[in-house]
Amino acid sequence: MSLDHIRNFSIIAHIDHGKSTLADRLIQFTGALSERDMKEQVLDSMDIERERGITIKAQSVRLNYKAKDGKTYVLNLIDTPGHVDFTYEVSRSLAACEGALLIVDAAQGVEAQTMANVYLALEHDLEIIPVLNKIDLPSAEPERVREQIEEVIGLDASEAILASAKSGIGIEEILEAIVKRVPPPKGDLDAPAKALVVDSWYDNYLGVVSLARVYDGVLKAGEKIRFMGVGMDYPLDNVGFLTPVLTKVAELKAGEVGCIMAGIKKLSDARVGDTITTVRRPCASQLPGFQPAKSMVFAGLYPVDSADYEDLKDALEKLAINDASLNYEVETSPALGFGFRCGFLGMLHMEIIQERLEREFDLDLVTTAPTVVYRVKQTDGQIMDIRSPGDLPPTTKREYIEEPYILANIMVPAEYMGPVMQLCTDRRGTQKDMSYISDTRVMVQYEMPMSEVVMDFFDRLKSMTKGYASLDYHLLDYRMSDLVKLDILINGDPVDALSVIVHRNISQYRGRELAKKMKELIHRQMFDVAVQACIGGKIIARETVKALRKNVTAKCYGGDITRKRKLLEKQKAGKKRMKQVGKVEIPQEAFLAVLKVD
């Protein structure tokens, strides 16, 4: 197969704009799968991807298409995730392509995440083909959306393809546009082999399977290959294509995208973004930089039953095999026992990992409040990264604390502008820009602390705009802030899993609200339970969960008051003794309450 007949392309879109459905139609149209094997969202292989209707891991498929010019082309589709947390996955997928289909919902128009992905594609110099999807909807306005694409993104949308992935309209036009407009890959077959790892996943029988784009040379089964980033050598057992079913072949040549199976046991040895070459004839340099995924949000995961600790450890190991952006380390908590401090790309990533642990591995988990990475300058001049409120040094040992700030792009219908601006201001945001994309839609830019976004900002934004707002954000820098650690004491003992780092201005309010919430959630015991919120040793709020008590004077009937008093005093002394030895069970909901306090 000559390079001229290969096209590598990806699909970029906002969540729910019909990307995976379009991929299904392309697979169906080119006959890559029989009718019997077709199911909705073929490329979304995880149950949770299908249920939530989102793509998490980048997947890939090789299609053979006979074009109108009579030639047969090989089209390599690399599917990309569309959610803000998975931008790193998108950038890897785009690096392996020469072109991209930009899918925009003809009813909803350009969304924040569409913009972010388009800019990524333009950075990689890709040929972008705009496609207006869902044109069969009664609310579709293709002309308005065309203007939006031209005004907001600056792409020429006069030749944008009108399509409907659901009813199969415009699929052939899309395939023809890919053949005509996407440039063929460049590559030298005689040069030393050089390939980029686009994705890696774990197969129970084959070990780690890596999806790679070959730039130069040939990778043959039976050769020894080297992963240059980690410096590991492996015998190459098999190579193959995904059609989307794995099909083995003898070799992968320059320009092609395929799977590499080398019996690798650990995913960390086949890092995404690494360069593969052969040991016999290595290439001179690695492909330009891919950074390892950086965790932005940290949370503690603990098993409800401490006997499940080993199961949780195994489950995290298995998930980390398939998810290079998840990292974790062992953590112990006096309140919750043994568990793990896990790092995630963002809030959605965290929810998905948690859901997969509970669903696929049948674990009951307690999750602590998520925190971002704070930076502290200590009095001895050292800079320290704080991933958990428990790591924060005391006030006497720190000079200042810095927290990460993000630039948030929010697209919102004009009628909801007021509440959205109020929400951003409440979350310590400062407005940077505001522009009308159309008569009814506004794009606003806010700089705000990331810690204010990780809690429940996205949920609040969606609910106050009836689901019409879209959000995209990226990290700006670290800035000094007046932050304090808020502790919750139960009967005088701090519960580390309930500690949070908050801004001083709202710390009093948060403390009061959290104490009230705890009072509601902690079950009544046989003795009084004091719930206190404290900052740096100073108690700022207190609530008492009243004791359950038996009516000890019920059997007295008439008689002297001193008799009743004696019984009550005796009960009081008993409760006091009980309080000294009694342990308070804190229910799972109490740990989640930290997230819900507004």
Swiss-Prot record:
| Keyword Secreted tagged | no
Q: Which reaction does it catalyse?
A: GTP + H2O = GDP + phosphate + H(+)
Checking InterPro entries in the record gives: EF-4 (IPR006297), EFG_III/V (IPR035647), EFG_V-like (IPR000640), EFTu-like_2 (IPR004161), G_TR_CS (IPR031157), LepA_C_sf (IPR038363), LepA_CTD (IPR013842), LepA_IV (IPR035654)
Question: Which residues does UniProt assign to the signal peptide?
Answer: none
Q: Which UniProt keywords apply?
A: Cell inner membrane, Cell membrane, GTP-binding, Hydrolase, Membrane, Nucleotide-binding, Protein biosynthesis
Positions of GTP binding: D16, H17, G18, K19, S20, T21, N133, K134, I135, D136
PROSITE patterns, from UniProt? Answer: G_TR_1 (PS00301), G_TR_2 (PS51722)
What topology in the membrane does the UniProt record assign? Peripheral membrane protein
**GO MF:** GTP binding; GTPase activity; guanosine tetraphosphate binding; ribosome binding; translation elongation factor activity
What's one GO-annotated cellular component?
Answer: plasma membrane
Return the Pfam families for the record: EFG_C, GTP_EFTU, GTP_EFTU_D2, LepA_C
Q: Give any single GO term for biological process.
A: positive regulation of translation
The residue ranges of the tr-type G domain are: 4-186
Compartmental location: Cell inner membrane
Q: Does the keyword ATP-binding apply?
A: no
- The Enzyme Commission number assigned here is 3.6.5.n1
Record-stated family: Belongs to the TRAFAC class translation factor GTPase superfamily. Classic translation factor GTPase family. LepA subfamily.
Q: What does this protein do?
A: Required for accurate and efficient protein synthesis under certain stress conditions. May act as a fidelity factor of the translation reaction, by catalyzing a one-codon backward translocation of tRNAs on improperly translocated ribosomes. Back-translocation proceeds from a post-translocation (POST) complex to a pre-translocation (PRE) complex, thus giving elongation factor G a second chance to translocate the tRNAs correctly. Binds to ribosomes in a GTP-dependent manner.
The protein, known as: Elongation factor 4
Traced from the root, the source organism's taxonomic lineage reads: Bacteria, Pseudomonadati, Pseudomonadota, Alphaproteobacteria, Magnetococcales
